[in-house]
Amino acid sequence: MMKGAMGCPVAAVMEGSFSCTVANRFYQLLDDESDPFDNLREAERCWQQRKNLSKVVARRGDPGSRGCATRRELQKQRKQLGTPAPPPQPGQKQAPKQEECGGKDNSRAEKEHKTAWRPSFMEYLSSETESQAELTAQSLFRPTAKLNYERPRGCGRGRGGMQGRGRGGGINKSFDGFDQRGKREFGRQNDNDKIEMELTAPMEATAKTAKSPGVSEGELLNKVAEGKPREEVVQEMTLDEWKNLQQQNRPKHEFNIRRPESTVPSKAVVIHKSKYSDDIQKGELEDDYHIFRRAVNDITFQLDINFGSLPRPGCGSRGARGRGRGRQMEETGPQPEAMVQIVAPNPDDPEDFPALT
């Protein structure tokens, strides 16, 4: 049951008849003829009037607001000028002035210079084509860091590897462990210098030997080759080019493979010759090839299998067991000699197996 405005007669009738009332939340629409949009339009009109009034007041200018603005400007000027420092006491050391260490203006200028000086990787990659004289002049004759007496007094060495006062002064400083100045480039130039020195040495040796009479050109080449080993010049190439170069320089293996020959060489010796190889005719092989097939090294047909020499076991040979029917060995007479059976016929022999016509 919702609580409604009991003063309203409609609410009292609804509560008496239906035991519940529907109350107006804002208690503004007390009659059915009033429109809720009228209230919204009235509120919007009042808000617009207040807005216009505030604009008019801002144009005319409030003397109180002007006074507040002037006070704020005066406070900003006082902060910029700064309060005068108290006179130094005799027992205390005087702090360094802002003019000596640079000040805020100098720090801003250093930041701008820092951002302008910061190099990129592409610049150093493109600088590989510079001349050797400029690199040697920069690396050898340019001081890497200022000496202690050259630094201004009171301005310590700060962090970072940039130029400027109070922040250290080295171009050779590396960024996050990586030297962007082109260290490998300078090393590469040194390698080139070494290679040039080594190349000029054998050239001088060849010039001296050329002056001496009675020396052939082959001996000169041998002397140059016997000298110091020549270092290979570093070249830039892709992986595919390097693989192709390795394939070209790789020696080719030549195998002496003997081709199969149908004829038997004259120096060949027959170790084992088959017994029936001469008796077999080619025609019979072609006719019986699909019926009988035997391996070349099959020796089963050469064995003589004879089962007549095996002794037969007796019933009582294991002793007098059971009812005593076992026979003793003395009772048996002398056994006759084993009969030799005839060798099995040879299937390949036409006499043993004549062809059926």
From Swiss-Prot:
GO MF: ribosome binding; RNA binding; translation elongation factor binding
Role summary: Ribosome-binding protein that promotes ribosome hibernation, a process during which ribosomes are stabilized in an inactive state and preserved from proteasomal degradation. Acts via its association with EEF2/eEF2 factor at the A-site of the ribosome, promoting ribosome stabilization in an inactive state compatible with storage. Plays a key role in ribosome hibernation in the mature egg by promoting ribosome stabilization. Ribosomes, which are produced in large quantities during oogenesis, are stored and translationally repressed in the egg and early embryo.
Record's compositionally biased regions (Gly residues): 155-171
Region (Disordered): 56-116, 150-186, 313-357
Gene: HABP4
Keyword Iron-sulfur: no
Keywords: Cytoplasm, mRNA processing, mRNA splicing, Nucleus, Translation regulation
Ranges annotated as biased composition (Acidic residues): 348-357
One of the protein's GO biological processes: positive regulation of RNA splicing
Subunit structure: Associates with ribosomes; promoting ribosome stabilization. Interacts with EEF2/eEF2; promoting ribosome stabilization.
A GO term from the CC aspect: nuclear speck
Comment block on domains: The C-terminal region is necessary for nucleus and cytoplasmic localization. The N-terminal region is necessary for nucleus and nuclear bodies localization.
Entry's family note: Belongs to the SERBP1-HABP4 family.
Signal sequence interval, chain numbering: none
Disulfide bonds: none
Name the record gives this protein: Intracellular hyaluronan-binding protein 4
Entry's localization field: Nucleus; Cytoplasm; Cytoplasm, Stress granule; Cytoplasm, Sarcoplasm
Regions of compositional bias (Basic and acidic residues) in chain numbering: 96-115, 176-186
SMART domains referenced in this protein's UniProt entry, alphabetically: HABP4_PAI-RBP1
